[in-house]
C-alpha cells in the first residue's frame, strides 16, 4: 500500500542551505525511501525569481518520491497542511550589526511564522528551526504558537553533534559510523559544550569509551571542544559562505531520527524545550541527548555529570537565558 505524501515546508528555500536541502528531501533522505513528499518552499519576495528557478530544477530532476511542489512568498500558502516544517529562513548578522538588531529582526520573523504555522499547519506538525540564533528563534516560535505542542518545536544541534563525531573519527582514524553517543549540550553557538564522556567507538573487541581510546584528556578537554565550537566560523573563512551541505544533511538526520526513531543504544543531540533535566533551567530550548521512538523524543536521563561538564553546561545555559531576555526585550 503506497503511503500518503507528507508535506514538508522549507523556509528560506532559495538560499544556500535550502538549495542543498530540497533535493535531499525529494530523494527520501529525510523521511525514508518509501515516503512520498510534497515540498512547500517559502522565501521573501526579492528571492521569488530564484525560488521559481529551484522549483524548475526540482521538476527537471524527476524525483520519483516528489509528488508536488509549492513555491511561494505567501506564508499562509506555504504553511497550509504541512506535516514537517524546516525553518531555514532568518535574518543573517551582517558586519557591524549589533546582536540586538539581528535578534529583533529574527523575533519579528519567527513571531509571524509561528502564527501562520499555528493557524494552518497539519495537526502534530513537527518543527525544526535551523536559522540562527536557532535556540532562541525556536523559543519565540513556541511562545507564539501555543497550540503547537512544545515537544514539537525543536532546533538543530545535530550539525554540531555530527561535527563532534567527525572530529573523533578523524582523530582515531575510524569510520564515523562506528562512533556514537557524543552529546552537544546547550546553545547552537560557540558556548555549546561537546561532551565525549559517554561516547563509544565500535572496535573488533566490542565498544570502547572514546576517552580511553583517545587517551589524551588535554586534547579532548581543549582543542577538540574549541574545534567543534568554532567549526562554523572555520567553514565561512574557507568557503566564504556558511556551511550549507552539512547543515542540510544534519537537518535530514534530525527529522529522520525523530520520525523514524534512533537505533537501539544510540542517542543523538536535539535542541528541545527544557523540563529541568540535568539542572538546566526550564523554559529554554537547550540541546540535550535524546532517544526517539514512535515519533517522539525523550531526554536520556541519569548520565553522570562531572565538575568540568557542569561548568560548561551552566555557562551555555546562562548564555541562553541572556538571549531569551534580549529576545523578550525586542517584543516590547
Swiss-Prot record:
InterPro entries attached to this UniProt entry: L-lactate/malate_DH (IPR001557), Lactate/malate_DH_C (IPR022383), Lactate/malate_DH_N (IPR001236), Lactate_DH/Glyco_Ohase_4_C (IPR015955), Malate_DH_AS (IPR001252), Malate_DH_NAD-dep_euk (IPR011274), Malate_DH_type2 (IPR010945), NAD(P)-bd_dom_sf (IPR036291)
Coiled coil feature spans: none
Active site per the UniProt annotation: 188
Topology with respect to the bilayer: Peripheral membrane protein
Example of a GO cellular component annotation carried by this entry: plasma membrane
Matching PROSITE patterns: MDH
Known EC number: 1.1.1.37
Keyword list, A-Z: Cell membrane, Membrane, NAD, Oxidoreductase, Tricarboxylic acid cycle
Keyword Lyase: no
BP GO terms, sorted: malate metabolic process; NADH metabolic process; oxaloacetate metabolic process; tricarboxylic acid cycle
Keyword S-adenosyl-L-methionine: no
Substrates-to-products reaction catalysed: (S)-malate + NAD(+) = oxaloacetate + NADH + H(+)
Reported pH dependence: Optimum pH is 7.41 for the native enzyme.
Gene Ontology molecular function terms on file: L-malate dehydrogenase (NAD+) activity
Tissue specificity of this protein: Expressed constitutively in roots.
Record-listed NAD(+) binding positions: 16-17, 43, 90, 113, 132
Residues that hold oxaloacetate according to the record: 99, 132, 163, 188, 243
Record's subunit section: Monomer.
Similarity field: Belongs to the LDH/MDH superfamily. MDH type 2 family.
Function: Malate dehydrogenase; catalyzes a reversible NAD-dependent dehydrogenase reaction involved in central metabolism and redox homeostasis.
Protein name (record): Malate dehydrogenase, cytoplasmic
Native source organism of the sequence: Zea mays (Maize)
Organism ancestry: Eukaryota, Viridiplantae, Streptophyta, Embryophyta, Tracheophyta
Amino acid at each position: 500500500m503506497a503511503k500518503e505524501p507528507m508535506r514538508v515546508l522549507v523556509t528560506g528555500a532559495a538560499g544556500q542551505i535550502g538549495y542543498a536541502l530540497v533535493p535531499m528531501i525529494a530523494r527520501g533522505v529525510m523521511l525514508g525511501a518509501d515516503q512520498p513528499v510534497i515540498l512547500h518552499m517559502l522565501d521573501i519576495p526579492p528571492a521569488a525569481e530564484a525560488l521559481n528557478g529551484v522549483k524548475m530544477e526540482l521538476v527537471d530532476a524527476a524525483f520519483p518520491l516528489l509528488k508536488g511542489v509549492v513555491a511561494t512568498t505567501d506564508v499562509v500558502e506555504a504553511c497550509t497542511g504541512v506535516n514537517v516544517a524546516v525553518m531555514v529562513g532568518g535574518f543573517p548578522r551582517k558586519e557591524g550589526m549589533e546582536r540586538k538588531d539581528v535578534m529583533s529582526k529574527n523575533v519579528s520573523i519567527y513571531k509571524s511564522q509561528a502564527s501562520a504555522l499555528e493557524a494552518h499547519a497539519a495537526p502534530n506538525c513537527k518543527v525544526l528551526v535551523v536559522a540562527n540564533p536557532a535556540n532562541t528563534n525556536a523559543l519565540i516560535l513556541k511562545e507564539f504558537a501555543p497550540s503547537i505542542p512544545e515537544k514539537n518545536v525543536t532546533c538543530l544541534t545535530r550539525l554540531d553533534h555530527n561535527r563532534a563525531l567527525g572530529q573523533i573519527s578523524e582523530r582515531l582514524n575510524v569510520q564515523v559510523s562506528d562512533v556514537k553517543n557524543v552529546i552537544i549540550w546547550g546553545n547552537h553557538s560557540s558556548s555549546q559544550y561537546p561532551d565525549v564522556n559517554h561516547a563509544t567507538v565500535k572496535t573488533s573487541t566490542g565498544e570502547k569509551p572514546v576517552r580511553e581510546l583517545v587517551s589524551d584528556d588535554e586534547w579532548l578537554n581543549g582543542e577538540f571542544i574549541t574545534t567543534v565550537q568554532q567549526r562554523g566560523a572555520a567553514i565561512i573563512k574557507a568557503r566564504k559562505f556558511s556551511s550549507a551541505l552539512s547543515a542540510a544533511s544534519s537537518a535530514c538526520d534530525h527529522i529522520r531520527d525523530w520520525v523514524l526513531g534512533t537505533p537501539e543504544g544510540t542517542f543523538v543531540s536535539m535542541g528541545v524545550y527544557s523540563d529541568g533535566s540535568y539542572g538546566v533551567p526550564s523554559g529554554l530550548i537547550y540541546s540535550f541527548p535524546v532517544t526517539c521512538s514512535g515519533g517522539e523524543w525523550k531526554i536520556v536521563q541519569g548520565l553522570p555529570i562531572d565538575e568540568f561538564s557542569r561548568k560548561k553546561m551552566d555557562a551555555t545555559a546562562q548564555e541562553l537565558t541572556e538571549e531569551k531576555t534580549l529576545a523578550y526585550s525586542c517584543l516590547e
